[in-house]
Amino acid sequence: MPIPPPPPPPPGPPPPPTFHQANTEQPKLSRDEQRGRGALLQDICKGTKLKKVTNINDRSAPILEKPKGSSGGYGSGGAALQPKGGLFQGGVLKLRPVGAKDGSENLAGKPALQIPSSRAAAPRPPVSAASGRPQDDTDSSRASLPELPRMQRPSLPDLSRPNTTSSTGMKHSSSAPPPPPPGRRANAPPTPLPMHSSKAPAYNREKPLPPTPGQRLHPGREGPPAPPPVKPPPSPVNIRTGPSGQSLAPPPPPYRQPPGVPNGPSSPTNESAPELPQRHNSLHRKTPGPVRGLAPPPPTSASPSLLSNRPPPPARDPPSRGAAPPPPPPVIRNGARDAPPPPPPYRMHGSEPPSRGKPPPPPSRTPAGPPPPPPPPLRNGHRDSITTVRSFLDDFESKYSFHPVEDFPAPEEYKHFQRIYPSKTNRAARGAPPLPPILR
C-alpha cells in the first residue's frame, strides 16, 4: 500500500511538458491545414476578384456606351450629365426637360435613353436597345446584360414611370414655385403700405395671434435708440396723432374706450382711404400703434402706477394690489414675455376700457409734462438689454388701459423706526447652531 502513493507525484510534473508539446504539435498540424486553406482562399479570392472586375467592366461599358452611341450627335456634354443623373435624381429631372425639348428631334431615341441612365424603367431600355442596335451591335449585346437585371427590378420601372409624370410635374412645379414667390411679393406690397403706416401691424396681418411679439420686435427696432425716439418713429406715420395726443389728451380715450369703432375714422385721418380695408383687418391691433406714441407718457407719469396696474387688469382688483405692487410687475413682465396672450388682452381691452377709458385721459394729461419715470425701464435694462426692455414696455403698456394714480388709495405714510430681527438677536445671544435643532 505505501508503494502506490509515491508514483502519482512523478506523473504530476510531466503533464505540463506534455501540454507544451501538444501545443507545439498542434500548430504544426494547423499550419499544414492553414497552408491548404490559404491556398484555397487565395484561389477563391483571386477568382472572385477577377469576376468582380469583369462584372464592373461589363456593367459600366454599356451604361457609358449607350449615351455615347445615342447621343453621339448631341455631344459629349449629355454623356457627362447623364452619369450625374444616375448618381442624383435631381440631375435626371433636369435632363428630362431637355429630352422633352429635343423630343421633337428624336421622340423614341433620347428621352428613353436618358431614363435608363437614371436606373429607369425596364420596358424602356429595350426601346433604347432597339435604337442602339442599328448604331452598334456590340453596344446592344452589352446592353442586354444590364437590361436583364433592370428587368428584374420591376419596382424601379414603376418608380420611373411616376418619375416621368413627376418630371412633367416637376417641370410645372419648377415653373410653379416661382409664381408663389411673386404671390408672396404680391402679398408683401400691401405689407409695405402698413409698414409705412405702422411697422407692427404688418406682422399682425400675417400672423393674427403672434402680432404682439411681432410688434415687440418692431418697437425693439424702433425703440433701441431711446424711449423718446420711440415716439418719433411712429410719429412719421402718426405725426398728426402724436402732437395731437401730446397737445390734446382726449384723443387717447377714443382709442382706449371703443377700440373697434374710432379706429375707422381715425385711420383716414392718419393715412389714405384705400388702406381702410387693410386696417379693418387689424383694428384692435392698430390701436397699440398710435397708443404707443401716447401710452409711454402715462407710464412715465407714474411708474408705480404701471407697476401696480399691470397685475390688476387681469385680476380686475387694482386697489387691493395697489399697496405693494412693485415686486410683482417684473414677474408679470417676464410672464408676458414667455407667454404673451394677445387675444385675451384684446378681449379684456374691449370689455374693460369703457369703464377705464374715461379716467385715463387725466393721467395722459398729467404725464405728458413729466417724462422722468423712464428710469424703471432702465432698472430692468440693467437685468436685460435696455432696448428690448423699452420696446417690450411700450408694447405691453399699449395693450392695456391703466387706471390713473388718482384711482388708487394713497399709500400709508412711512414712519421710520428700528426693526428688531429675531435672527440677529438669536445669533448675538445664543449663536446660530443651537437654533436649527430647536426649529426642527
Curated annotation (Swiss-Prot):
Signal peptide: none
The keyword RNA-binding appears for this protein: no
Comp. bias regions, Low complexity: 116-133
Keyword Metal-binding among UniProt keywords: no
Biological source species: Homo sapiens
Ranges of Pro residues composition bias in the record: 1-18, 176-193, 222-236, 249-262, 356-378
Record note on quaternary structure: Interacts with WASL and WASP, and this interaction results in cytoplasmic relocation of these two proteins along actin filaments. Interacts with NCK2 resulting in the localization to sites of focal adhesions. No interaction was seen with WASF2 and WASF3.
A GO molecular function held by the record: actin binding
Subcellular location(s) of the protein: Cytoplasm, Cytoskeleton
Gene, per the UniProt record: WIPF2
Residues bearing the modification Asymmetric dimethylarginine: R37
Gene Ontology cellular-component annotations: cytoskeleton; cytosol
Family recorded in the similarity comment: Belongs to the verprolin family.
Predominant subcellular localization, coarse grouping: cytoplasm
Keyword entries, A-Z: Actin-binding, Cytoplasm, Cytoskeleton, Methylation
InterPro entries cross-referenced by the UniProt entry: WH2_dom (IPR003124)
Function as written in the Swiss-Prot or TrEMBL entry: Plays an active role in the formation of cell surface protrusions downstream of activated PDGFB receptors. Plays an important role in actin-microspike formation through cooperation with WASL. May cooperate with WASP and WASL to induce mobilization and reorganization of the actin filament system.
Region described as Disordered: spans on this chain: 1-36, 56-387, 419-440
A Pfam family recorded for this sequence: WH2
Protein's name in the database: WAS/WASL-interacting protein family member 2
Note: Access to the profilin-binding site is masked in the full-length protein.
Residue segments, region Binds actin: 49-52
